[in-house]
Amino acid sequence: MVNRDAYNELNLNKKSQETNRKPSPLSSYTSISRELDYANQSPFSSNSFSPTELKARTSATFDVRSASTSPINASDFHKYSHDPFQRLFKAKGNASFSKTKSFPSSVTYSPSEETFPLTSGMNKSVHEYPFTLSESAISSSHKSSIPERRNFDSSVSVSNPLLHWNNVDTLLRDGSLENVNNSRQDQFLPYKTFSSTISNSDFLHRESSFSSLIDEESKLASLRNLNINDRPPLPVLKNSERNLLHRQLLSNHPFFSQNNVSLSTNSKNYSTDFTKIQSDSSLLQNRQQNHRIETDQLSHFPDHLDPSRIPSPYQPSSLQPLESRKLHSKVDVHSKKLNALSQLNPILRSENVLQNDNHHSSLSMDNDPTNVSTKNRNNQTVGEHPYVDDNKKKKKGPAKPKEKATLGKTVNSFFGSHSTSNYSKVPLSAKLTGEKSDDLSNLLKNKGKKKSQDNQIPHLVGFLGHLSTICKDQYGCRYLQKLLDENPKVNASLFFPEIRQSVVQLMIDPFGNYMCQKLFVYASREQKLSMLNGIGEGIVDICSNLYGTRSMQNIIDKLTSNEQISLLLKIIIPSLTTLACDNNGTHVLQKCIAKFPPEKLEPLFLSMEENLITLATNRHGCCILQRCLDRTNGDIQERLVNSIIKSCLLLVQNAYGNYLVQHVLELNIQPYTERIIEKFFGNICKLSLQKFSSNAIEQCIRTASPSTREQMLQEFLSFPNIEQLLDDCYANYVMQRFLNVADESQKFLILRSISHVIPKIQNTRHGRHILAKLTSSTSS
């Protein structure tokens, strides 16, 4: 006979493997049938197991035919964990389970068919659900806390209508289960109605515990007995009820008397017969009849209790917290209007009324409009009431043409209206102050309407002492320039002393520089020299400024005598290096080189020769030297070129100096070219590999004589690593330049020298261009 323990261990291992496969919801019934087969085919049959164990196994797995079930040991309980009915009663909080994991005695299995088969895609009616609950499964304490359900389907006989599927659906729809902690509607039992059908997947998916449902319902029902101050706010309250409840709980106003409001939900199972909040009608009647305002009663009414809108001497919502005990009134404390109001309302006494505050009036804190001097809401002041009738507006006639204001009228509006006869007698301090000087721009733009003898242009003596201030104003500068154009000889003499004294400040001013340029045109010879001396005091500041460099170039164009040119060069040369390297100052030097004759520029060129390296390696300085080479000739040019050739090996490797060396080569003066190439011999290949110097080497190849070019080519081809030169991003252009200017013998020499590296460079980026040019030149 087979050992019972061995067979039991084999059977348990086999069943644990089936359980670990995580069967689908429908596969559990297959395992139930399989377990039945094992039980029937066992060699021990029913004699191998104890009656209690066999009854527990068979009744718990597939056929619970009796009204009660025997306890199941904890060691055997894991065997049935795949059963959906068992998982149904393992929910959290199920009080019906004991520590021995026994089923509740009220669970009965009542299948409509013998084996209750469930196959995929098959629907089962609610009448075929595998179990019902009897009243014994519900404790008496739970039953007492569950209200009676009135509407349910009586066609199906159940022990307790409330716990039927339809009742669960009703509870969910009514909102009674909305506040159940850690649960969702889709986690409850299926809540289909009796007439609907439920698929197998729905039935197996929607499973939970009736006991958990009962506990949560009891907790929810127990909230009805809480005090109003201890009751938590529930989201199921309607908006109007919640707002009303919050107003009553939070407000300390005597208008809101405390009411015992019962818990309100959306469910029809609970009564909503709580006491409605009733307002004190006497307060409202007194308010409407006598227009009285009780001091302690603020108008924080609910929407449905909002009193009728009546005229009020104040707006409570606009009061500050510290002023809430007093009333705002637009009337004065000692006015008759307040006395009349105080007779109707004793609250409106002088001690209870704040005095009229301009700040509050501007904020419109009263009910009546406060800004009575505006036409509309854009605060366009026209002296009319804001709600004036459009029909009563005065019709405007045709607009009168505006008369042009004269300059004299504008000046008189600034200095005061005086006649030309007595204008000079008025002290200047009385005519011009600091505040008026600041507002000069606005006053000069004013337009007059009448012409009179008093509106003539005053004598310029009235402006003396303040010309520099007027020149810095846009309209003042234009006005003074116009005066200069009208009477240049007299007015220039009057303006010059003050302009000369502030010439440095005016030359860099956005508006004053135009006055300096205009005055230099009408100034005499002595005045021009004096102005140049004044400019020399701040030549660097003037030439480095955006406005100063423009005014300085304009003055250079107006220099006519050698004396003026010599004086200007004498002023510029000490600051030559600073001005030549400046973005704005370089334009002043270029203007001098282009405007003055070369013989007058000799001091300037000699100064550049002394600072050649500094200027040649600067972005703006190299441009100045190139302009000098173009303007000079003879000895001056030779001196500059000698200085450049002397340092050409250093300059050719500089980002800006190489342009100066190329400019000397572009002069196409053969002695200069040969001297430069002689400086490069021995470094042709190294210079060809560099970015800046390779451009100068190409320029040497173009301008060199044939004999000199052949010497350069031999040095280039004799480089040990010729492949590096041919494939270099800069040196390959030097080789292409050799091929462009080489004759037949030189091309043959190039082909013979690079033939051994052609297979290596024919597929490179730069080597392909060299071979293509070499092939085209040899074939032609």
Curated annotation (Swiss-Prot):
Q: Which stretches does the entry tag as region Disordered?
A: 1-29, 298-330, 358-411
Spans of repeat Pumilio: 462-497, 498-533, 534-569, 570-606, 607-642, 643-678, 679-714, 715-752, 753-780
Q: Does the keyword NADP apply?
A: no
Chain ranges of the PUM-HD domain: 435-778
Q: Read off the SMART domains from this record.
A: Pumilio (SM00025)
A GO BP entry: post-transcriptional regulation of gene expression
* CDD domains cross-referenced by the UniProt entry: Pumilio (cd07920)
Instruction: Return any one Pfam family short name.
Output: PUF
Name any one GO molecular function.
Answer: mRNA binding
Skewed-composition ranges (Low complexity): 311-322
Give Gene Ontology CC terms: cytoplasm
Ranges of compositional bias, category Polar residues: 358-382
> Bias category Basic and acidic residues: which stretches?
298-307
InterPro entries reported for this sequence: ARM-like, ARM-type_fold, PUM-HD, Pumilio_RNA-bd, Pumilio_RNA-bd_rpt
Q: Which UniProt keywords apply?
A: Repeat
Q: What is this protein called?
A: Pumilio domain-containing protein C4G8.03c
